[in-house]
């Protein structure tokens, strides 16, 4: 049996990608909370498969003003199936990297599968992805005639970000439609700034103000096991990145550690 979401007149946002799905989804949930308060439905944890997604959507009620769902995959056809169920208004692909190669065979196959989320968009939906990504041409072809809202750190997109860091402190400046704002981020690393910029793009495509985007990103406190900061003994700082890993996410975590000052232990 197949559940298809229809007749829902609220923003229904979706996120997929090799890395950063859950972090981006939680950032978006925080942004939506800034705009809509408690009237937001979001995927719990990473319940992002063919069981978790329908369970999340079955929780939609008349009290909700927006929803954000996460979609994961480990074999061909899974994202297309999930997108066909949700029919989101706005969809984000965070990236396509070396994850689930055992089921997909190549990064190109992963990128193509991730991009099928755009084919499941509603007719007036918007695709969001990074204009700096090597798979931008592939994803643009999968979007077809639907709208896009690309983001970039190089300035070649409607939404432009600038990242700066000092030790484990980081900030993201956003420029969009003649407005600009800077926010402090709870998570270190340029990859997390990219997650935040993508989440901002989804929110802006859904009609949320840049002020609410900034408020939501500022309120975001991080996700368990994903570069969470803890106090250690003797003034040490422990970065917990133990949730899950693939080669690219491990490298991103090592890059964060390498950029810090003082003695370091991996």
Which residues does each PLM region occupy?
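Acidic, Mg2+-coordinating active-site environments of NTP-dependent enzymes
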Residues: 10, 90-237, 262
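Thr-Gly-centered strand-to-loop micro-motif
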Residues: 42-44, 69-70, 186, 200, ...
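Buried hydrophobic packing segments
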Residues: 28, 32, 56-57, 196-206, ...
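Conserved cofactor-binding/catalytic machinery of classical short-chain dehydrogenase/reductase
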Residues: 24, 198, 249
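Residue-level recognition of specific faces of alpha-helices
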Residues: 56, 70, 216-219, 226-229, ...
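Phosphate-binding loop of NTP-binding sites
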Residues: 1-131, 135-144, 259-261
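Active-site beta-alpha connecting loops in nucleotide-dependent enzymes
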Residues: 223-225, 242-266
